[in-house]
Regions:
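An N-terminal hydrophobic leader/cap segment in hydrolases
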Residues: 1-16
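Short beta-strand or tight-loop elements
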Residues: 13, 23-25, 108
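Conserved HGGG/HGGXW glycine-rich cap/lid loop of the alpha/beta-hydrolase fold
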Residues: 18-78
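Serine-hydrolase catalytic machinery in alpha/beta-hydrolase-like enzymes
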Residues: 73-82, 170-176
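Catalytic nucleophile-loop/oxyanion-hole region of alpha/beta-hydrolase
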Residues: 79-94, 147-156
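Conserved acidic catalytic loop of the alpha/beta-hydrolase fold
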Residues: 92-110
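Conserved hydrolase catalytic core segment
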Residues: 108-147
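A catalytic-pocket lid/entrance helix-loop region that shapes and gates access to the active site
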Residues: 131-176
Length: 176
């Protein structure tokens, strides 16, 4: 199967944004600085952005902002730190972070692309800031309801036991 994504691309800018409450979020921009503004929201929660996610956008047409949400990837505070205070890591905080990033980059309206948990966050952002969303692309949609989380974390193993066991063997006994 051929990879349908765009060629690999490196960021032309990146940084850390202090969003308060002891949190700093890592962000990066890639593509065409004069292109149509777009935001990528990664899944997880807990993961972060990766180079392959830059390839979802045509680099000639889009100016893409990607960021590691609070507690994820290169952002600080990390949720994996023992006894980390996560009280300031809520959906409302993440929505405020997106708005801070939008203002930082001088974007009036942008296309929002979310994957998995990013679809949930993207929908919540669009509800709170509809005037700032030009279009939405939602992939691997989940609303992270209790039933969906149970499906992902337990039930899927009954249907795909071999794949589930392969996945479990790759998960460390204790996270760093």
């Amino acid at each position: 199967m051929q990879d349908a994504r765009f060629p690999e691309i490196e960021p032309y800018d990146s940084g850390m944004l202090d969003v308060g409450d002891g949190h700093q979020v890592y962000w990066e921009c890639c593509g065409n600085p004069a292109g149509k503004p777009a935001l990528y929201l990664h899944g997880g929660p807990g993961s972060g952005v990766s180079p392959g996610q830059r390839r979802f956008f045509d680099p000639d047409a889009y100016r893409v902002v990607l960021f590691d949400q609070r507690g994820c990837g290169r952002s600080r505070l990390l949720a994996s730190v023992p006894r980390a205070d996560l009280s300031a890591n809520t959906t409302a905080h993440l929505i405020a972070d997106i708005e801070a990033l939008r203002r930082l980059h001088g974007v009036e309206r942008w296309t929002v692309l979310g994957m998995s948990w990013g679809t949930t966050l993207g929908l919540a952002y669009a509800q709170a800031h509809a005037r700032q969303v030009d279009a939405m692309v939602l992939a691997l949609v989940t609303t992270t309801s209790r039933r969906e989380v149970q499906w992902i974390t337990r039930d899927v193993g009954r249907i795909f036991p071999r794949e589930w066991n392969r996945f479990l063997t790759a998960v460390p006994d204790t996270l760093p």
